[in-house]
Amino acid sequence: MGNSALDLNPPNATFHLSTHGSDWLWAAFSVFGVSLLTVVAWTFTRPRGARLFHQIAIVVLTTGSLAYFSMASDLGATPVPVEFRGEGTRQIWFVRYIQWFITFPLLLLELLLATGLSLSDIFTTLFMSIVLVITGLVAALVPSTYKWGYYTFGVSALFYIWYVLLWHGPHTTFAAGGVLRRGYILAAGYLSFLLLLYPIAWACAEGGNVISVTSEMIWYGILDIFAGPIFLFFFLWELRGVDYATFGLHSGKYTDKSAYAPNTAQAAGTVPATTSTGAAGNV
C-alpha cells in the first residue's frame, strides 16, 4: 500500500508538499521515533539523580516525532502568498515552528547546564532562541518584503546565541572538569554550525521561495536529525561517566516513599515526623 497522506489530506497551497516529500518525512519520523524509544530505554538504565539530561532529550525527541508525524501527514501548514515567484501560495509549516519553539531552548539548556554559566545568562540565551523561532515564523507568514525585517531580528538573536556558546560558555568554570569542557566545546561548535544553516535554509525556502516545498523538507529534515537525535546521542554519551553531583542540579523534590510512612509514635502525634535526606534532591 502506497503513501496516501496527500489523498486523505489534500494540499492547501499552489506550491505544496509532494508524495516523495511525504515519504521522506515518514522516514524522518521513524528516525525520531526509534531515537525516542532508545533514549527512554537508556534513561531507565541510569540511577535516580542522573537522568535530567536524558529526560530533556526525551522531551526534544517526543516533540520532533509529533511534528514529523504531522508534516508527513500533510497537516500543520497554512497557505501564504509567495514573494519572488509570481502568483500563488506556498505551504508554511507552522507545526515545525511549534517544534522548534520547544526544542531549540531545550537543546541549548541541555548544553549550557554543563557549563558554569549563571542562571541569568542561561535564561537570556534561551529567550534569544525563542526570539529566533518566533521571528522566523512571523517572517514566514508575512507575504511582503517586511518579512526580511523579522529575519534580521532573528539573525541578530542568533549572534547572541553564538557568543554564549562559543565564547562565554567555554570561559566559565566546568565543575565536572576538563573532560566535560572538551566535550562541550565539540558539541557547542557542532550545534553552532547547524544553527548557521537554518537561516540559510529559511532564506531559500519560506523567504525567497527559491527551492520547492519538498526540497525544503529534505533540507530541514536533515538539519533536525543532526540537531536532534545525533547531537543528543553524542552529548549523552559524553556525559556517561560524569558525576552528576558536580552539576549541583538537585531539585529537592524526590524523596523515598519510606520517608512518608510514620511509625506508631508519629501516628499518635508524640514524636515529630522526620524527612529522609538520603534520597532528596534527585532529578
Swiss-Prot record:
CDD domains: 7tm_YRO2_fungal-like. Its main location: membrane. Keywords: Membrane, Transmembrane, Transmembrane helix. It is found in: Membrane. It is a multi-pass membrane protein. The chain crosses the membrane at residues 24-44, 52-72, 97-117, 122-142, 148-168, 185-205, 217-237. Gene3D superfamilies: Rhodopsin 7-helix transmembrane proteins (1.20.1070.10). SUPFAM superfamilies: Family A G protein-coupled receptor-like. GO terms for cellular component: endoplasmic reticulum; plasma membrane. InterPro entries: Arc/bac/fun_rhodopsins (IPR001425), Yro2-like_7TM (IPR043476). Belongs to the archaeal/bacterial/fungal opsin family. This is Protein FDD123. It comes from Trametes versicolor (White-rot fungus). The lineage of its organism: Eukaryota, Fungi, Dikarya, Basidiomycota, Agaricomycotina.
